[in-house]
């Protein structure tokens, strides 16, 4: 999102702010706040926000008090013992006046007086003041800026009369930096350096320097979204401000355009518009202070009058201009694409190796500028330039955006062209620049060199009152709709041929500067933006109490309308059911409530990070797990292990499309073993790949926090990962036309070669889980904490996870488990490999988990289930089983659950004891039984427990200890 810096005084030149004025449109007259003759920055931001533009105050005036023009009458140089040379000056200024119009005595303390310090009275008597100054860049008779006692400077500096170097200094002669108008602090500000000729001769001693140097102006920063390029100018923002307050807008552009001339331009690549103008006999000496100050507030540095004028017109109108030194051009200009291996030395000192798709402006000797982006040094305008060729073009936004990103050049011009500039404004902006050059640089306008424009008016859009009602959700009259659209510049007429008694139809033709208005939805957005968002009624949505997951339909519809009469626009469902925004939001809130901190990382990584942390299950969503396998299971049929190119392993890029069998004996064609997706134009050349896991970003985030002393971290991220192109027809299940009984559902991908971009959630923990306090022992994060984090994710999604020991190249061997949900492998959890953690300057004990949310959603989340609280009591018993060391506890829990049946509400492992003299171990579980309908009896609990023991004995040879 681009930011436009808007000086307040500049904006108010183009709008009328008289109190009580009512605009021609009459829109929102009851809701608009009336401003005074001089609205402050807060008023402007409030008005712009009401029409959809956010902003903030950037430059607020920090100068106040008696800051006036003084003349240096005489000075005496003194060298002090510390080696510093100072000047003891006599400066003639105007004395500040008190309310009774009597001069304020120099002997009085200004801080205790009530005199008018904000503006000097030019009719007051002149007086001479003694001032100590450390600068030496001025002479007798120079006009300077004097800050008298009682004035305030930027940074909270309060000027008082005080003794300096043995003299009482009755004020201060200010520098550029002290006044906030520049960075020069070596010498004081001489007005002869700022003003020349008639402007300088009109300045009198005692004049208010704040008004003279425009130091009371403030600026606001307005955020411009990519679709609102028409607002990327003072003219555009002024139009929106006038719209927000029902006041007239004064267009600064001249209506008269320049006549066509005879200069020849070779347009091999046709732009949307291209105009040039030859101007001679330029006096390129000094830019007037009012323009320098406005450009400074707009964030642009002053260069020379011609360049400043082109920048000024660009900020004012939104049309970028470029000035060429006409004497540096050889032959005629040509607009073409760059040749192979052609280069351009830019005005900022860089050398660009141009691409054959780059649009350039060239002459007989080569490229002069990268069109719409930046100019070249060979034809740059300097203070010695006498003849210029002024260019105003309009180019394809996509071409300019690609060139800008290709060369990593983001200029004021490219920011505007990439957002689309009004084609019809080019010639008027050129005339405006010519007018300023003639007035400020004595330029002689010779002729309009070339005039080319290719503009086709947008086709009218058919709009009805029912269209607005359907999109917005509330009704407006035809008069309101027509009035609001005319207010933004649209041509609106009634279409009686398509109108009916119930539906009023209009033909709407957007203005040339609103290329973003292309359909009914765009027009509806403008209508509600102009009329007011407060006209949209509030609707309360509630989650009904139910035991089953909510279906996709959440509203009761009757004849295509909601119960309250508002229509609901049809939404095309996605091809596959990924995790929804609401599910992700609730999961994030759940994790944050548990003490985790959410972070957002860039999706760009280097190749090493993309490979080592790839969670391979995410591209194998058909992977299943058999809970009855006993010992630590091998990856089941249907899962392809990923290996990086060049590494050894059974699978890899050469094993794409291997067919295996799922448990239902249905054929599955795997997704290809994915490699990292590279970016053609990365922001950082060292991170030119899309992430395949969230863990690399969390490791970098942890490193940044640890380097700043934040050592105890529990962070998480919810975001997409990018796993290459899919060739499989299913996300879960098989290729059968009917629903696979083993997989329980069918989800077909309709198109081939799609990039699989599942949402995943990842948690990373390191440091202290509990800080040491009085009566409380501290504790570091350990493996149990990250398993608890995975369980928190499960609770947030309304599902159950269990864990099976496994291996993964990013995790510590023996301290890694894969996460299973409904017999499907959906992620990993464990301790990060210490060597990987150390590469990020992290301690050895770093724990993480990563879960594929899209897979969980397809398996069936139940976030919105509201369960009834139990009314019957629970019965708790312990169970200790002795079995082999190689049997995983998760497998035992799964079997015990199956054997105990529905009465078993919860089971968890509370103790493990390994026998030293045998290969046996004892596992102790806490079991909670409950019947939802009635009170349990001891006989039923014992029977359920015996059934569980019997099944565990048959599966694993387990023996219950009594």
Curated annotation (Swiss-Prot):
Disulfide bond residue pairs: none
Family annotation (SUPFAM superfamilies): Anticodon-binding domain of PheRS, Class II aaRS and biotin synthetases, Nucleic acid-binding proteins, PheT/TilS domain, Putative DNA-binding domain
A cellular component annotation (GO) from this entry: phenylalanine-tRNA ligase complex
PROSITE patterns the record matches: B5 (PS51483), FDX_ACB (PS51447), TRBD (PS50886)
Region spans: Insert: 621-675
Protein family: Belongs to the phenylalanyl-tRNA synthetase beta subunit family. Type 1 subfamily.
Name of this protein: Phenylalanine--tRNA ligase beta subunit
Phylogenetic placement of the source organism: Bacteria, Bacillati, Actinomycetota, Actinomycetes, Micrococcales
Name of the gene encoding the protein in the UniProt record: pheT
